[in-house]
Amino acid sequence: MDKRYSVLMSVYKKERPEYLHAALKSMTGQSWRPSEIVLVCDGPLTTELEAVLKDAEFHSLLKTVRLEKNAGLGAALAKGLPECSCEWVARMDSDDIAASNRCEKQLRYLETYPETDVLSGTIAEFQGDFRKKC
């Protein structure tokens, strides 16, 4: 099975840097590591968000696409999708934290059921301290 996949995310200036950091860390810590993380900057970002993007922990996987002004999630993802180089794309929001085996489980499912076009999963929501589930 081809384990290559891209991750597609969008971020804009009102996002919390600690959430973006946790989201990126959850993807770089996958049991099957992504080939790339395509991150669309939907307009100018804060200094704190820019610092997260420069973190060496993510730098080798991060492919940044920048929009001059905020265009909204749909437009940002439409710009980012053609930049993804893999057949399979895992979608993440900049405040999502993925289980460490999320992508492995999803890719194994796709291997078993190759007729699948779109695949999702369950979520656990959090408020405030993202290390604690609601």
For each of these PLM feature ranges, what is it?
Residues 1-134:
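Nucleotide-sugar donor-binding/catalytic module of glycosyltransferases
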